[in-house]
Amino acid sequence: MNDFLVFSEEVAQAKAEKKPIVALESTIISHGMPYPENVQTAKDVERIIRDRGAVPATIAIFNEKIKIGLTEGELEQLGTSHDVEKVSRRDLPYVVAMKKHGATTVAGTMICAEMAGIRVFATGGIGGVHRGAEQTMDISADLQELARTNVAVVCAGAKSILDLGLTLEYLETHGVPVIGYQTDVLPAFYSRTSPFRVDYRLDSAKEIAQFLETKWKLGLNGGVVIANPVPKEEELEESYITAIIEQALKEAEKQHITGKSVTPFLLDRVKTLTGGKSLQANIALVKNNAALAADLARELS
């Protein structure tokens, strides 16, 4: 057993009883949404997973330990503190060794989930290749993690502030399958559609579970992107959100915002420019992904 892992009572019991478990990231709480919506969404997502017969395991770093499953107090702390680090692969040893509090990104959560023996993870959207990456080389560590870590990631596609075409090219190069759940095209986070096709369409959690079992039994390491479109009633029109993202990107460039700060800045500007509609879509798609992830975890267990 990894000395750095600490399981909540609920998750430890689920592991002992071989119950289905769904990993959840924590940067969505610390950096992805404003308070109090962030903490409320985290609680709602955990409830949805429980209601569908699985056990939620929100992951974060506290006091030199990787916590697999958080208390309500810890969720609150992540949602209100201003000194929580974003933790991806490179940051994990620093945050643990220096006894800092950390919220795990998609990549960070995948690493910790695999350490904990959890194979299904629900999030909002994965990171990817940023627009203008030909010059900046700004490519999310999430993509490398998907190529090497055996965790299935249920998401609403890549965040639409990214270059979706190049993100798909990168995933293809690294052998990461992109499955569309009941869709032939890649959802673009806030929108159900984009100009890009997924690799394979599968229409049930059972089919996706069969795909995953086969991939890993073949000894093919790496994750899978399971792209689940935002619910129709909450989606934002593709052309509408694209124009707003373009404006936010120009503002980020003008203000010389780079690196880790780009995504939180863009999400915040998009929220303001849509009058809060993007936040509502974000909350809806995270809940939708949690439901599918719970169904998938049940099929795999």
From Swiss-Prot:
Documented EC number(s): 4.2.1.70
Residues forming the catalytic site: E25 (proton donor), K159 (nucleophile)
Signal sequence region: none
Binding site residues for Mn(2+): D138
GO biological process assignments: nucleobase catabolic process
GO cellular component terms, semicolon-separated: cytoplasm
GO molecular function: hydrolase activity, acting on glycosyl bonds; metal ion binding; pseudouridylate synthase activity
Gene3D superfamilies, alphabetized: Indigoidine synthase domain
Cofactors demanded by this protein: Mn(2+)
Annotated substrate binding sites: K86, V106, S140, A141, D142
Co-factor binding comment: Binds 1 Mn(2+) ion per subunit.
Matching InterPro entries: Indigdn_synthA-like, PsuG
Reaction(s) this enzyme catalyzes, per UniProt: D-ribose 5-phosphate + uracil = psi-UMP + H2O
Alphabetized UniProt keyword annotations: Glycosidase, Hydrolase, Lyase, Manganese, Metal-binding
Similarity comment: family membership: Belongs to the pseudouridine-5'-phosphate glycosidase family.
Main function: Catalyzes the reversible cleavage of pseudouridine 5'-phosphate (PsiMP) to ribose 5-phosphate and uracil. Functions biologically in the cleavage direction, as part of a pseudouridine degradation pathway.
Quaternary assembly: Homotrimer.
Name used for this protein in its record: Pseudouridine-5'-phosphate glycosidase
Taxonomic source organism: Geobacillus kaustophilus (strain HTA426)
Annotated gene: psuG
